[in-house]
């Protein structure tokens, strides 16, 4: 993720641990709510409710440029999560046998996969990131 973010000229990348957001640390929440684009990994099931809550608050502040990631271990669960995230860019991914992170499509059994870095770079370029990108 960092590689994709650093490939965007002028992007500033911050990685914020979930625990800081969950605890309500003001500096972490300020960065989260004020970032131009938030990249949020929803792969950890027990973190999803809090992340969706924080994402909803972020959207209420008018910050609608969000990229949601999900590690695809179960096509059905991935598809259900994707449907929940319909208003955001959703990218499911997995680790290929060659040890590369690649995107998946939960709706079909796809064999043509894009690298996760390429997909993130494309989405960031579409969002015309000028200042800050946050990783969660």
Language-model segments: residues:
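Amphipathic coiled-coil/heptad-repeat helices and related helical stalk/stem segments
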Residues: 24-25, 51
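Conserved beta-strand scaffold positions in the cores of enzyme catalytic domains, especially
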Residues: 15, 66, 90-92
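Conserved beta-strand-loop-alpha-helix hinge of the TIR/SEFIR fold
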Residues: 31-64, 71-73
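C-terminal interaction surface of TIR/SEFIR-family domains
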Residues: 84-136
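Residues at the C-termini of beta-strands that transition into short coil/loop
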Residues: 17-19, 70, 94-96
């Amino acid at each position: 993720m960092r590689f994709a973010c650093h490939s965007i000229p002028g992007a500033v990348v911050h990685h914020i641990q979930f625990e800081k957001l969950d605890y309500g640390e003001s500096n972490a929440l300020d960065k989260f709510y004020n970032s131009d684009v938030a990249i949020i990994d929803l792969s950890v099931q027990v973190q999803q409710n809090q992340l969706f809550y924080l994402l909803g608050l972020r959207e209420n502040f008018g910050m609608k440029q969000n990229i949601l990631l999900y590690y695809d271990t179960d096509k059905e669960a991935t598809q259900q999560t994707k449907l929940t995230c319909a208003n955001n860019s959703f990218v499911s991914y997995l680790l290929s046998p060659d040890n590369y992170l690649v995107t998946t499509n939960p709706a079909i059994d796809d064999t043509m996969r894009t690298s996760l870095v390429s997909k993130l770079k494309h989405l960031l370029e579409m969002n015309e990131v000028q200042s800050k990108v946050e990783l969660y």
